[in-house]
Amino acid sequence: MIGWSAVSRSLRLTASIASVSLLFAGIGCAPRAGSLSGAVTPARFPVTDIPRGHQRIVFRWEYVDQALAAKGEGIARVASPDSVRLDFYLDGGLGGGYAIVVGDSISTPGGDQVRRYLPPVALLWAVMGRLAVPATPDTVAKVDGDVLRADIGRNPVWRVTFVADHLTRLERIVSGRRLEWVSRTGSDVRYQNERSSRSLTLKITSTDEAPPFDPEIWRR
């Protein structure tokens, strides 16, 4: 007779195999990243630190995936050197949510159920124009006119693009395929997850200096 422990182990193994299969299926659907273009150059990146002080950024947002579509207004409260609170309000007063990013950590009121809709921390910081990927000995940079591109790390590779000293794109590449990315063009910011067809777009409407924020906004 097979005991419950054996059944449990079997179920866990089956679930693990299914998860790995889905992961590789998702990676296979993502487009190939290709190689860097341009001439090899020293990997010296422009400064992307958050400006000293506090900022209040107002934006319109829209979220779309295979099962859900939502849009509304949003506010980002940014504090130097590495803190931001993002509040999202649904159109029609139907509710909302928030995410707090401090350094390399994210907290949300809904835990993992909400966090799965958000980009990884490095890509969230790219939304704000900040490069938060540590440089490694594997970094390769190339320049083409006023465009600087670099691959940082190994599997995953973070591919960053600067145009005239501004961070305009950050991609996460796994096994040679571009799984997700953030692009910044003027006041438009877009996050795209290629595996799940998930996207979050922001249209920035205003950016203003602000007085110090209430410390309570950084707590859950």
Give, region by region, the residue ranges found by the protein language model:
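A short, polar/proline- and glycine-enriched secondary-structure boundary/capping micro-motif
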Residues: 95-103, 118-121, 179-182, 200-203
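N-terminal beta-strand/beta-hairpin edge segment
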Residues: 60-65, 70-106
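Gly/Pro-enriched, hydrophobic low-complexity segments
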Residues: 141-220
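Acidic/charged, solvent-exposed loop-and-adjacent secondary-structure segments enriched in E/D, K/R, S/T
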Residues: 106-137
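N-terminal leader/targeting segments and the immediate start of mature chains
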Residues: 28-80, 111, 118, 211-220
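Sec-dependent bacterial lipoprotein signal peptides
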Residues: 1-29
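Residue-level recognition of conserved beta-strand positions in structured domain cores
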Residues: 88-90, 110, 172, 193
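Short, surface-exposed beta-strand-loop junctions and turns on beta-sheet-rich folds
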Residues: 91-95, 113-116, 155-158, 176
